[in-house]
């Protein structure tokens, strides 16, 4: 310790000698380069893997880079409309308008709960003019009847020609049964349900009874609401409304304004009421400029959606009956039909598709710079795991880093002489001889033999992972190294 203190005290005198300055510089460079080479050899990664094996599935995509996302809040975007969501393969849900605390559970299966009414039974036949007769004791029969009317029109049910709908009520719970046993009727109803909630597979080809059961339930966040499904419900009711058609153009430049019509030269902010569980999120002029170049981005489609319909969105805040008519008038302005059709085709082909609800982007937390958001795709009614599109966000992070480095290089060229950069480069190159540790090929993580890279999952020696993704114990593993 005394020698170290003496050395530090002599530094002012040492730096007067050019050779001593060179020795200090070489020593610092050698130590730093040695640490970097050890890191690149994989030794630190191996130690980190052994500590976190079986406990963590996280992965870093670079210094200060994080994968983040935001979710559009459909209840604030379309407050007067019922919102739709999918719970599982057989159950879907329609939530009442204005964030109601009740909803309608749509069950598709083969369980018969109601039979044709007999004298003295509680079972009734539903008619187009007396929907409320199925639930006279409900607290809000008019709202429930309105949602059911929209639903039946959306699936194109004809009360005069199609099979009779049965219903009954017990205290505050009512049940409605649609019989889909007739093949042509089943194909028509299920195809319309698929447009609202997603594919139900080849349901109508099954043998036996085929039924849709509707019952009222209490809303308790059973699933995440999908505003695209609500728009589909509007479109499928469009034959009852007078609509003006307008489609988004493919190639044009556009600017942004706030909800009051004032110009926003600094970029665009998604207001807090548009997002789920997130604060105000702003995207600068860089993102807007990218949207003028990249016309295939789902995020840019969403920006156009909000930008073209500022007045419509402001009107949606007035909870009046006239609001519904103006919403029907503006539905083709809210989102282009070809975008919905494109994603529905991808859904039918079992290809991950965009539901225009959740978007991901790579954010550099140190510089507060982010990439252009991209759609978080959906398959079979659920969002893809981060590892399913790992290559995409790693490539996106590489592009973001390249943009940052290019910008920093241009700025540094204005302040730093090129000769100084060359001097640093050649002095660093001299010490690359310490890269011999790369010859050791130290492994960094485990692979299951015969399968691809399990990253970001960290497998134990029993081939398990704490997140539950790898559950089969005792599979043969081998050590591998990050390329």
Swiss-Prot record:
Record has Membrane as a keyword: yes
InterPro entries listed in its UniProt record: Arena_glycoprot, Arena_glycoprot_zinc-bd
Residue numbers binding Zn(2+) 2: 445, 447, 453
Extracellular side: 2-17, 54-58, 59-422
Residue intervals on the Cytoplasmic side: 33, 444-483
GO molecular function: metal ion binding
Transmembrane segments: 18-32, 34-53, 423-443
Superkingdom classification of source: Viruses
Site (Cleavage): 58-59, 249-250
Keyword match Transmembrane: yes
Lipidation (N-myristoyl glycine): 2
Entry GO terms, CC: host cell endoplasmic reticulum membrane; host cell Golgi membrane; host cell plasma membrane; membrane; viral envelope; virion membrane
Glycosylation, residue list: 73, 88, 130, 179, 216, 355, 363, 380, 385
Site feature Important for GP-C-mediated membrane fusion, where: 33
Summary of the function given for this chain in its UniProt record: Stable signal peptide (SSP): cleaved and functions as a signal peptide. In addition, it is also retained as the third component of the GP complex. The SSP is required for efficient glycoprotein expression, post-translational maturation cleavage of GP1 and GP2, glycoprotein transport to the cell surface plasma membrane, formation of infectious virus particles, and acid pH-dependent glycoprotein-mediated cell fusion.
Protein name (record): Pre-glycoprotein polyprotein GP complex
